[in-house]
């Protein structure tokens, strides 16, 4: 605890916030002013962190879920002494190239744990971090991993649908080291929260198994005491802090306009006078800055003791900690997958079950792998020999998310951002839209999150068009920096998994059918991954110079091969190109792409989805065999015939263009 009055320490956050917003002419300043005491209590008395080692493995995590109030976080990081958050960064708030973006963007070296983006994502990210901590605490022991995850939460976060999902699941799993600090200012962009919300929020959390406390006004001592009580309770905690938005800004505090109205120099001068603040823009008195810097050094002794404990571990355990901290996979994981590819060659299996077999093999080699699905274990088979992660068993490696796809996706990102674990989430492709914010933010952050999907087309049959995701492949491929894999058989499944796990700069989606995948690759050679270039010639023309090129993914590769056989028998030299990952194919040089696509040939693409995106590969004279609208109910084989996704249809398209 500092010997400086904490009130002016909180006011330093206010001053830096209003100066940054006034300088740029915009910004959401109301939340930082209202939550300044909450943040001061947390960062000066409870949060365990070390700006000299920002990525300390056993640091507490802080997530600003209400990210529009980002200047609160930036001010805290500057005040506590993060080298990557100098005062000059705050002066460039909301400018191109600044680390101080309008909403926080992940920069662990500067203390920004995660890009929270849209409201609600951050609270689920925080739950994922708390889950990762609970598992690692079991795996490595409390002497190596034992920390809390805090989130600053606004009214909007709690109104989002994902909030209901994650409140329920976190309470069920008793994630006791998860603490949410609710900035309960009862104001949002449209005005009074009562216009849209009337439930008893405290009762809502208690009903879900949370520890709930309420703190009045801007009382630093009361907030600190509540945090201490939360840390001692085995349940996840909500601390409802009744605040005033824009506190300290004369004429605007408590008003709707305090959310984000434009500030003038007259406003900032009035705030300085109200707070008794000396100095010009961005000036923090030395005694107050020194007190904040001491707060930033508060955990130095704990950090040093932790470092000594790690150094004294037996060599094998010390190596494991180092590997997990660095995000490296164990030796032999790649060889395990390639061995599986050789075993899967020539074998038929339900597509998603190939992935389930692969995950079971990976889990045996990778102790940090955590699997899970939203009430779809029987349909996707990604649990197998794994046992459930529960409130009673923190060593379980399968998470039963319940029907909570949105929470699952955001929690996966939180786990990956936390580090030390390799989580995967499995669901039907039609539910991908519930995870879309997660994909987008993972891609933006460059997080290597792995998403697995099943039931990928009209091939699911009688469940009908509501569950036949004809448009979703195209929408996933539209997301920058995300790799979308649609393997054609067990060999390509193993190759896709290898590529997804090896990738460290962005997320991957692995997409499988419910129906069986027959073998399209008769063998898999050791050390060979044909999918690594995104697309490759699976079967070259054998009847002379190539005249036609058939392009396909997933289940439709087999249809293309059947069409090729008929065309070749009729004297049309035809090649089949499997395209498991468009994004990797786009990374290849022009010579390779042309050698695969052969632009001078007739090109026909085959995919049980909409055409969007295929024209870049088939060209202006090419054709597409697939879906042009939604599906319908019927047996899978009949549906393929009904919609004309057949070898005969492919042959007709080729002949029409020769």
Task: Describe each PLM feature range.
Residues 57-58, 240-249, 253-331:
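Terminal amphipathic helices with adjacent charged low-complexity linkers/tails
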Residues 3-4, 20-29, 57-65, 109-120, ...:
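A short glycine/serine-rich beta->alpha loop
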Residues 95-107, 125, 131, 135-146, ...:
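Thiamine diphosphate
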């Amino acid at each position: 605890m500092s010997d400086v009055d904490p009130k002016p320490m909180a006011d330093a956050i206010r001053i830096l916030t209003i100066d940054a917003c006034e300088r740029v002419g915009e910004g959401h300043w109301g939340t930082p002013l209202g939550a300044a005491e909450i943040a001061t209590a947390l960062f000066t008395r409870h949060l365990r962190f070390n700006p000299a080692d920002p990525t300390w493995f056993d640091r507490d995590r802080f997530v600003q879920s209400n990210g529009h109030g980002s200047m609160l976080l930036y001010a805290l990081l500057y005040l506590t002494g993060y080298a990557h958050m100098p005062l000059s960064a705050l002066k460039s708030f909301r400018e191109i190239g600044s680390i101080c973006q309008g909403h926080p963007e992940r920069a662990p070296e500067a203390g920004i744990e995660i890009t929270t983006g849209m409201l609600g994502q951050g609270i689920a990210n925080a739950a994922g971090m708390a889950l990762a901590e609970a598992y690692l605490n079991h795996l490595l022991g409390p002497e190596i991993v034992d920390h809390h995850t805090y989130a600053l939460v606004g009214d909007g976060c709690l109104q989002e649908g994902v909030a209901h999902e994650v409140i329920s699941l976190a309470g069920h799993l008793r994630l006791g080291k998860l603490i949410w600090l609710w900035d309960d200012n009862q104001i949002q962009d449209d005005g009074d929260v009562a216009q849209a919300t009337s439930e008893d929020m405290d009762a809502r959390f208690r009903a879900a198994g949370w520890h709930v406390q309420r703190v009045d006004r801007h009382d630093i001592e009361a907030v600190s005491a509540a945090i201490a009580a939360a840390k001692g309770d085995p349940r996840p905690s909500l601390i409802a802090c009744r605040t005033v938005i824009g506190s300290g800004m004369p004429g605007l505090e408590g008003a709707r306009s305090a959310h984000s109205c434009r500030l003038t120099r007259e406003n900032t001068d009035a705030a300085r006078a109200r707070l008794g603040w000396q100095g010009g823009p961005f000036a923090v008195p030395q005694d107050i800055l020194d007190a904040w810097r001491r707060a930033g050094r508060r955990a130095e002794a704990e950090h040093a003791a932790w470092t000594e404990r790690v150094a004294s571990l037996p060599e094998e355990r010390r190596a494991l900690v180092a590997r997990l901290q660095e995000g490296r996979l164990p030796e032999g994981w790649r060889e395990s997958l390639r061995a599986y590819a050789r075993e899967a060659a020539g074998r038929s299996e339900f597509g998603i079950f190939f992935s389930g077999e692969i995950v079971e093999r990976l889990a045996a080699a990778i102790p940090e792998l955590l699997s899970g699905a939203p009430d779809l274990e029987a349909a996707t088979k990604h649990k197998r020999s794994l046992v459930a992660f529960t409130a009673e068993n923190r060593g379980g490696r399968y998470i039963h998310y319940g029907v909570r796809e949105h929470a699952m996706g955001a929690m996966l990102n939180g786990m990956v951002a936390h580090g030390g674990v390799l989580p995967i989430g499995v669901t039907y492709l039609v539910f991908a839209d519930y995870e879309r914010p997660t994909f987008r933010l993972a891609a933006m952050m460059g997080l290597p999150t792995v998403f697995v999907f099943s039931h990928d087309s009209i091939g699911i049959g009688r469940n009908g068009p509501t569950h036949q995701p004809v448009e979703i492949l195209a929408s996933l491929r539209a997301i920058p920096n995300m790799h979308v894999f649609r393997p054609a058989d067990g060999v390509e499944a193993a190759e896709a998994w290898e590529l997804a796990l090896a990738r460290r700069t962005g997320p991957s989606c692995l997409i499988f059918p419910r129906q069986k995948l027959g073998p399209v690759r008769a063998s898999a050679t050791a050390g060979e991954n044909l999918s690594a270039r995104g697309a490759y010639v699976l079967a070259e023309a054998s009847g002379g110079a190539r005249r036609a090129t058939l392009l396909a993914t997933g289940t439709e590769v087999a249809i293309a091969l059947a069409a090729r056989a008929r065309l070749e028998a009729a004297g049309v030299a035809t090649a089949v190109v499997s395209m498991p990952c468009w994004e990797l194919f786009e990374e290849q040089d022009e010579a390779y792409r042309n050698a695969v696509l052969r632009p001078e040939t007739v090109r026909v693409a085959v995919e049980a989805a909409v055409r969007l995106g295929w024209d870049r590969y088939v060209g202006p004279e090419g054709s597409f065999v697939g879906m042009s609208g939604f599906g319908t109910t019927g047996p899978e084989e009949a549906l393929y015939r009904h919609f004309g996704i057949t070898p005969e249809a492919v042959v007709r398209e080729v002949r029409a263009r020769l």
